[in-house]
C-alpha cells in the first residue's frame, strides 16, 4: 500500500489576529508545522496549537521563519548562514518547550516561506538549518522541498529528510516553486490540484508550468490552511487518498 504524509502550517495568527481554521483542518492531516513567533505565532498561540495537535494525535514540527511579522516571513532577507543557524535554534527551542510541557515529543522541522525557498537552492543556508537541527536533536526529521539542496544538507549532518511537494503550488522546470509574486503561483482550481497530487504520489512525476515533466517522489504533501476553502480542500484530498488506497500517515 502507498502511504503519504499530509502536513499543514498551523498557529500562524498573532495576538488578536487569527489566520486559518486550525481546529477544522486537524482531522485531515497527519503532521503539522507550528509557527514559532518570528513570522507568525506568539507564546499563547504556540501553546494552544501544540495542545490541539496532541489531542488529534498528529505529529508536531517547528516551523521557523525569518523575523518578519509584517511580511509573514515571505520576503527575502539578506542573512548569513550563522544568522540562519541562530534563528532556527531559537525557534525550535521555543516550540520544543511547549511540546515538552504538554507531554509531547517533537517530530520534525520545516522552514517557512522565504527561508524555505532560499534553502532549497542555497546549500549554505540549507546546511545552516540542518546543523541547527542536528545540534538540538539529530533524530528530528527535516521537511524540505523534493529534489533540492536539502538533500545534500541532510547527508552532511546525517539527518533524515522528508521530501515535500505542494498540493496547491505550480512548479518551474528546475523543480522549484513558482514565486508567489507570479500570477499562476497558486493552483486555485480544486480538480487541477487533486490531479497534480495524485500524479505525484501515484506516478512520481509532475508537470512544470512550461509542460516539462519532472520526476518527483514526495513523502509528504503540504496543504495550506489559510485559503478561503482550505478545510474543504484538505478534506477532499484526505478522502481522495483513502478512495485510491493511499494510507495517510506521518513518517515514523
Swiss-Prot record:
EC number(s) from the headed UniProt entry: 3.5.2.9
Coiled coil region boundaries: none
Name of the top EC class for this enzyme: hydrolase
SUPFAM superfamilies found in the cross-reference section: Glycoside hydrolase/deacetylase
Classification via InterPro entries: Glyco_hydro/deAcase_b/a-brl, LamB/YcsF/PxpA-like
Catalytic activity, as annotated: 5-oxo-L-proline + ATP + 2 H2O = L-glutamate + ADP + phosphate + H(+)
GO biological process: one example: carbohydrate metabolic process
Keywords linked to the UniProt accession: ATP-binding, Hydrolase, Nucleotide-binding
GO molecular function list: 5-oxoprolinase (ATP-hydrolyzing) activity; ATP binding
Gene3D superfamilies: Glycoside hydrolase/deacetylase
Described function: Catalyzes the cleavage of 5-oxoproline to form L-glutamate coupled to the hydrolysis of ATP to ADP and inorganic phosphate.
UniProt subunit comment: Forms a complex composed of PxpA, PxpB and PxpC.
UniProt record similarity statement: Belongs to the LamB/PxpA family.
Protein name: 5-oxoprolinase subunit A
Amino acid at each position: 500500500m502507498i502511504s503519504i504524509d499530509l502536513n499543514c502550517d498551523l498557529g500562524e495568527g498573532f495576538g488578536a489576529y487569527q489566520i486559518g481554521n486550525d481546529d477544522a483542518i486537524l482531522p485531515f492531516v497527519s503532521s503539522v508545522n507550528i509557527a514559532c513567533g518570528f513570522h507568525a505565532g506568539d507564546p499563547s498561540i504556540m501553546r494552544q496549537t501544540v495542545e490541539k495537535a496532541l489531542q488529534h494525535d498528529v505529529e508536531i514540527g517547528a516551523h521557523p521563519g525569518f523575523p518578519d511579522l509584517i511580511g509573514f516571513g515571505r520576503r527575502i532577507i539578506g542573512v548569513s548562514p550563522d544568522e540562519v543557524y541562530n534563528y532556527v535554534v531559537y525557534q525550535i527551542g521555543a516550540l520544543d518547550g511547549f511540546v515538552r510541557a504538554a507531554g509531547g515529543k517533537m517530530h520534525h522541522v520545516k522552514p517557512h516561506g522565504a527561508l524555505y525557498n532560499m534553502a532549497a537552492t542555497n546549500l549554505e543556508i540549507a546546511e545552516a538549518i540542518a546543523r541547527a537541527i542536528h545540534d538540538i536533536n539529530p533524530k528530528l526529521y527535516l521537511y524540505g522541498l523534493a529534489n533540492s539542496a536539502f538533500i545534500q544538507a541532510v547527508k552532511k549532518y546525517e539527518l533524515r529528510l522528508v521530501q515535500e511537494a505542494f498540493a496547491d503550488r505550480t512548479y518551474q522546470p528546475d523543480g522549484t516553486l513558482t514565486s508567489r509574486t507570479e500570477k499562476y503561483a497558486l493552483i486555485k482550481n480544486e480538480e487541477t490540484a487533486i490531479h497534480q497530487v495524485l500524479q505525484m504520489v501515484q506516478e512520481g512525476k509532475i508537470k512544470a508550468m512550461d509542460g516539462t515533466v519532472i520526476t518527483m517522489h514526495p513523502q509528504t504533501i503540504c496543504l495550506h490552511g489559510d485559503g478561503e476553502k482550505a478545510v474543504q480542500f484538505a478534506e477532499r484530498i484526505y478522502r481522495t487518498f483513502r478512495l485510491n488506497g493511499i494510507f495517510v500517515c506521518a513518517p515514523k
